Curated annotation (Swiss-Prot):
Annotated Gene Ontology cellular component terms: plasma membrane
Purpose: Is responsible for Site-2 cleavage of the RsiW anti-sigma factor. This results, after a third proteolytic step catalyzed by the ClpXP protease, in the release of SigW and the transcription activation of the genes under the control of the sigma-W factor.
Organism field: Oceanobacillus iheyensis (strain DSM 14371 / CIP 107618 / JCM 11309 / KCTC 3954 / HTE831)
Protein's recorded name: Zinc metalloprotease RasP
Transmembrane segments: 5-25, 174-194, 317-337, 351-371, 396-416
EC number: 3.4.24.-
Molecular functions per Gene Ontology: metal ion binding; metalloendopeptidase activity
Cell compartments where the protein resides: Cell membrane
NCBIfam families: RIP metalloprotease RseP
Length: 424
């Protein structure tokens, strides 16, 4: 149960912060945001605030921000349509009744002759009992369509995605991944405040019970200064030697309470994979890195850790694309849930660390220039900036549709790999 709650909380935060970035920059640019959704599929919960419908949906596979103009409008008025009009106190059309006009007895029913809801915001037509006097009505920029008793706000061109400059559109698309990096930095800052920041020297933190380190007599705050004939000055040097010597006795010199002591330990053997995904055996002795409280160091740690994690993920992604790493090592929702279950059992700090890493992963993946991802859409905005004119919407739509289908296929393959690896 704890894992389920942790997974839902983690998923909700990662997706919400990503989509919130898109939402905020869309609204700052003056775009009409029709919906802010967490999840896909049927709605579980919804409410409307400041023009936007906020929804939580059943399938936890992402989220989206639906901006006016990105997709064809569902409701389209054409000459010959019979519609009902309701007006505000200024005499402007405030509601356009598309059907079920009998439920709106005070609506003025007309037959549409001409309509422009993009630029001029007018509706022209004739009353049903008078086909000689052509009437013209000004439409309020926030007027509502009413169809099947559901209200949908009209979207004048100046509120649509395509009406904004390439810079504003690019920023709206980039804002989602950007917020994932901001979240990661914030989490690392929180970790720095809670547990301190890692010290550069090979200083031991917590000693795990029933491990070679405990059996050899290591204590927290011991500082490793030498292994064999090699001087040790950093944590990376210490862990590298331990990893490379599973089952081999290592003679170490430590500093404890200002005095040097000799101590020997035999690293245990643990299964792992190398940088290309091949199984290897590494050495472990069961110690955590030492930490210290440092206000300035906390901020540096947050940024450095985000940068290091970003670099690592990009390198792994490059190896995947070039075939150096098998697609079988990819994890989908099932694999991420299983990993979350293992992380939750190791403590809150590790759960925060795992959340930060996934947030960076989400940000990077969305910036990859693939169809249906933020990076793919940024690619089209960039091409428009270079060409001086946009790609035909029909061509871009096909590109994203095919890409989305391929991504869904990849998700199915990855999920099946997870199921085989974990359950079969």
């Amino acid at each position: 149960m704890t894992t389920v709650v942790a997974f839902i909380l983690m998923f909700g935060v990662l997706v919400s912060i990503h989509e919130w970035g898109h939402l905020i920059f869309a609204k700052r640019a003056g775009m009409l945001v029709r919906e802010f959704a967490i999840g896909f599929g049927p709605k579980i919960f919804s409410f409307t605030k400041n023009e936007t419908l906020y929804t939580i949906r059943l399938i936890p596979a992402g989220g989206y921000v639906r901006v006016a103009g990105e997709d064809p409008e569902i409701i389209e008025l054409k000459p010959g349509h019979h519609i009902g009009l309701e007006f505000n106190q200024a005499g402007e059309v405030s509601k356009i009744i598309v059907n079920n006009k009998s439920k709106h007895p005070y609506a003025r029913v007309i037959e549409v002759e001409n309509v422009d809801l993009d630029h001029k915001l007018i509706i022209e037509g004739y009353e049903l009992d008078d086909d000689e006097n052509r009437l013209s009505f000004n439409v309020n920029e926030k007027a509502m369509f009413v169809m099947d008793e559901r209200e949908t706000q009209i979207a004048p061109y100046n509120r649509q995605f395509a009406s904004k400059s390439t810079g504003k559109r690019a920023m709206q698309l980039f804002a989602g991944p950007m917020m994932n990096f901001v979240l990661a930095i914030a989490i690392f800052l929180i970790l720095g405040i809670i547990q301190g920041v890692p010290v550069e020297e090979a200083k031991l933190g917590e000693i795990q019970p029933d491990t070679p380190a405990e059996q050899a007599g290591f204590q927290q705050d011991d500082v490793i200064t030498q292994i064999g004939d090699q001087s040790i000055s950093t944590w990376e040097e210490f862990t590298s030697i331990v990893r490379e010597n599973p089952g081999q006795e290592l003679d170490m010199v430590i500093q404890r309470n200002g005095e040097s002591q000799d101590i020997s330990v035999v690293p245990g053997e643990a299964e792992a994979v190398n940088e290309v995904g091949d199984p290897i055996t590494i050495g472990q002795i069961g110690v955590y890195q030492g930490f210290e409280k440092d206000v300035l160091g906390t901020f540096v740690y947050g940024i450095e850790r985000t940068y290091d994690t970003t670099t690592m993920i990009i390198q792994n992604l490059f190896m995947l694309v070039t075939g150096q790493v098998s697609i079988e090592l990819l994890s989908g929702p099932v694999g991420i849930y299983d990993a979350t279950d293992q992380v939750v059992q190791t403590g809150f700090s590790n759960f925060l660390l795992w959340t930060a890493m996934l947030s960076i992963n989400l940000g990077i993946i969305n910036l990859v220039p693939l169809p249906a991802l933020d990076g793919g859409r940024l690619l089209f905005v960039g091409l428009e900036a270079v060409r001086g004119k946009p790609i035909a919407p029909e061509k871009e739509g096909i590109f994203h549709f095919v890409g989305f289908a391929l991504l869904m296929l990849l998700m199915i393959v990855v999920t099946w790999n997870d199921i085989q690896r974990l359950f079969l």
